[in-house]
């Protein structure tokens, strides 16, 4: 993937916005306004450039942040809220789909053995 600087300006603005607002509910309309494009053109351009939709990109950011927090021994329910997932069930399901482990299993990897 190209670096953030090398991306088309609308895609760069959207990726930067997503990185800064991943804990919030983000809509395609909001992203279209950030990109100064209509939402359908943005969706096509973003998906062509990044290989995934803006929503999947957002969830990827959230999972990355969640991994960091789980490694710090935070509870999965707390991590779900801190990373912008609507509920723990959605977070757990998506985390397992992407990582192959439940959030609790992932967290346990980092627990100090007593």
How should each PLM-predicted stretch be described?
Residues 34, 82-83, 98:
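Residues within the alpha-helical elements of helix-turn-helix
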Residues 31-39, 43:
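Helix-turn-helix
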Residues 54, 102-103:
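Proline-centered helix-kink/hinge sites
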Residues 1-17, 41:
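An amphipathic alpha-helical interaction segment
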Residues 16, 20, 25-29, 47-92, ...:
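Terminal helix-turn-helix DNA-binding modules in bacterial transcription factors
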Residues 11-13, 25, 35:
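Acidic, Ser/Thr-rich low-complexity intrinsically disordered segments
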């Amino acid at each position: 993937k190209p670096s953030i600087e090398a991306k088309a300006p609308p895609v760069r603005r959207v990726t930067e916005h997503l990185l800064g607002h991943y804990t919030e509910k983000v809509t395609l309309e909001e992203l279209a306004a950030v990109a100064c494009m209509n939402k359908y053109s943005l969706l096509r351009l973003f998906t062509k450039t990044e290989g995934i939709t803006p929503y999947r990109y957002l969830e990827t950011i959230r999972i990355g942040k969640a991994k960091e927090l789980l490694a710090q021994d935070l509870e999965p329910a707390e991590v779900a809220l801190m990373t912008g997932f609507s509920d723990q069930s959605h977070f757990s399901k998506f985390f397992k789909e992407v990582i192959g482990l439940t959030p609790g299993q992932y967290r346990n990897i980092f627990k100090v053995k007593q």
